[in-house]
Swiss-Prot record:
Family: Belongs to the RNA polymerase beta chain family.
Compartments (UniProt record): Plastid, Apicoplast
Catalytic reaction annotation: RNA(n) + a ribonucleoside 5'-triphosphate = RNA(n+1) + diphosphate
InterPro entries assigned: DNA-dir_RNA_pol_su2, DNA-dir_RNAP_su2_dom, DNA-dir_RNAP_su2_hyb_sf, RNA_pol_Rpb2_3, RNA_pol_Rpb2_7, RNA_pol_RPB2_OB-fold
Cysteine pairings via disulfide bonds: none
Protein name: DNA-directed RNA polymerase subunit beta
Purpose: DNA-dependent RNA polymerase catalyzes the transcription of DNA into RNA using the four ribonucleoside triphosphates as substrates.
Any Pfam family matching the protein: RNA_pol_Rpb2_6
Amino acid sequence: MNFQLKNFLILKTLKTFYIEYYKVLIYYLINSIKNYLGDKLYLYYKKNKYTIYILSDFLFFKTTNLTSNITDTVQEFNSKILIFLPLKIKNLKNNKYKIIYYLLGEIPKYTIEKNLIINGLKKTFISKLMFNYIGIFFNKFIKNNNNILYAKIIFNDKFIINIVLEENKCYCIFNNYKYDLICFLYLLGISMQDIFIFSRYNKSFYLKKLLLTLPSLNINNIINYNIFKYLSFFFNLSFKLNTYYIFNKVLNKNNSLYSYIKNFSNSNNLIALDFINILDILLDIKYNKKNITDLDLLEYRSIFTLGNYFTNQYSFYLKKFSNILHNDIFKCIKNLEKYKLNTNSFKSKLYFNLKEYLTVNPLVQYLEQINSFSEIIHKNRVTNYNSKLKQNLQIRNINLNQLGSLCLIDTTEGINCGLVISFTKNIKIEKRNNFQFPYLPVLNIKTKNFITFINSFLQQTYIVLFNNYYLRKNKLFNFFNLSLNKNSFKLKNISIQNMIYIKPMDMFSFAENLIPFIFYNDPARVLMGAKMQSQIVPILKNKRSIIITGYEKNLLNSTNLILKAYQEGIVVYVSSYKIIIRDLYNRKITYFLDKYKRSNHFTILHSKPNVWQGERIFCGQILTSTQDILFSEYIGGNNLLVSYGNFFGYNFEDAIVLNKKIIYSQLFTSLHFKVYEIIFNSLNKFSFEISTINLPKKSFYSKRNLDFFGIIKEGSKVLNNDILVSKIFITNINISLLPLYNLIYILFGKEIKNIKDKSILVSFGNSGRIVKTELFSYSSKIKSYLGYYLKCRVYICKQRLLSVGDKLCGRYGNKGIIAYILPSNDLPYTNTGIIPDIISDSLGIPSRMNIGQLFENLFGLSCYFLNKRLCISNTFNLPKVYIKTILYNYINNIKEKSGNLWIYNSYSPGKILLRDGRQGYKLSEPSFLGISKYSKLIHMIKDKIHYRTIGPYTELMQQPVKGRNKKGGQRFGEMEIWAIEAYGSSYNLRELLNYKSDDIIARTSLLSNLDNNIILDNITTTESFRTLIREIHSMNLNIEAFSSIDQLEGKILPININF
């Protein structure tokens, strides 16, 4: 028998946030109801006395129970949880009681996949790093060229004490009150003699000078009754030495350093003598004996989850409207007694709906569902943004205490760079929402295999090793290695104690661990490669990559997108939509599969069974495979034979030349959904919309795919301008046609109606196959308010082949636009007839410093001929001599085993001589050839190209406005321009850079020239081109433009450009 037991109280992973959402939320909600609403309420009504007991411990929750199959289709309903507060009403006159449920509000349902379903759309909550505003913190600032030290004691959000130390004085700040520290200590029962007795600086000249500047300490001199009244509310003030507590303990792991008594961590109270020790620590910092508190440590931060967000909102709501809620409860009970209602539930007038807050909150984001991996990455993001802290460069920078907890590379681009980051792959979260990460202890110059967890505060007490040490010939260097000690890199002796080793793969997130040879790439390109992993489109024919990192299978443990067995058992039934397993207790467990569902980005979500009938299943075993998960391994592309070199300029910069064989074999064909929604309206009895097959003035061919009700049939193929749903609008005739109406009614006995055809047609470029049709009926409230009574939704699935303008990418930040597609017989080939699949420019490798793709090409080529797969761990960080030897041995091994002598060239190892496909001659220089993994990105040409008849331009630069919603113009990126330049389409470039840009004169005359069939005028110099010329002139470079040769004199005429 195989069971799994998880302890959610000690450690919790990111997948257990939904448990915290329900358990912690209910716990805090019950406490907030007790604090703000109380336990009892009293009501007098018609000479009757009622006692209302608020049963907050018995909160009643009711859910809508929408399944995951419906949430993708029904957008009018929310998957929500209703919160009912039980009220026990007791009549003291006859001692009868009744229990009613008071509807307090609703919260959205939080699924086990960490999804929020709002209006039928899947969203997710981005966690937030919040500063712990409880503790004692030391810092300094500069004022008038003087260092001013201060200690901030934070008890809660409302009460904060600042102890400020300047050159000649030391004072306290209590919110808005400023008071001398020695006078404050005198109010706590500490005299000057006690300060000299208990302070460590009793012989210091600075402390004596500080005390002598004060006036004589007596009650009449130091008492300010306003301050005394304010402080007596928080402290137990006394004019004798107070050794008892004056306030609750400040919960902080570092407080044992600041407390006067040594067992402060075991004590629950703060005593008055601790202020003397705080003053001593300020003097230690002044004399450079101690350092200030580093507030950037992760130990001072905790994770702010969705449950914390809702508890704050509900506590604010109950606190603000507690009196109004009491009156509302009284009115509900009066109506209950007045009208003798038998209902057992009432709805609050201040019905608290958190859906409004979630739609505005920037932390609740539209879920990225381009592929399975993008969803995992989006849910593991965390933001470092806090409105109470300054957004300076120090917050955005990488802190050394983040090693193992937060990824060092993965972050967003643009203005949020450094503010939105990702968790590492093996992070654990404590019960109090603090971080823990794994490490390996180092004993006797060897790393042990057992893994333990440590937090960032205890990390500073250890010496952290990063990379494995290599044996050298000189034994003196074998005992030293680069390490991290107290936020600085040093060379340390390995034989010393208190050393830990952090694996390199534990310092990165999920995306970086899928990149082999990561240490041979530029970090900026690694970030780009990690971002493109979440932009890969699921394709029909996936293949497992030859070079892997070994983390492709471990990634599936962090996702709930695939079905896993809950118990051990035997598979009883398997079909395309469900799997039935009989467990060891003779129970049947049914697992339902997702079939052809659309994601948030209109890509396909499809599951297939991985097991067969009669197979024995163990607990946690993977049961299904999705569109990009195959053989329990994440797959996002295909292996292609890549040639690096120049091909007649068609692969200019990052442009790509593609073999037409790739399109015929449909290696990168993807499926996409187009959804049409049709609403039928009913204004009144005489004006309504219906669907029927009896459409007027329509041929039989146009209605060939419609059923009896005029709705398209599932599985039919539709083309442009085909009818999807027939829709006619019926109204009464006009008053002017009333005599004709009466005549026809008398002759034929039929009424005449005005019929208008409003059928929905397939828009241009959206032809495909009908996957499914759905019909929804509206509720009575929506029907009466909006007039809608029926909605029809049609799903069209269409295939997208590779075309010119699509974007392909590798795993190392290498990406490019397809500029030219050639048949196989025009491409170069080897002596054995092997033709490359794509040709890429070789200049992008040294300029981007991503050497890892060259290693993948060579290792992939060798594994292809040897029929093997190679696992490259992220700890693979060998010197260049080692990896060069391994590569040459692999290539030489292919040459001996396969018999292909052309693979290994001793004069240029790794390069292969090719022949021209058009003429058959050998090329003058050898070309680099290898096998690498390429993927198709979602930036496809069909989504980029759009048109407009007329639209706005910016007033300042006269460029087309950005965005389709603003009717913006066509915008081309950097890579798209490179592809156009590589293709040699000069007229398109002229149109983009002049007519569609800020050439106002040419733009105004373009329309009249096209209408009158006149030759286009000569274009003028645009402002963007003039800006480019000025930037070139600033580098002491000159540009001159020349026209064609003068036919009379045979001279080249220059063109004058007015700058």
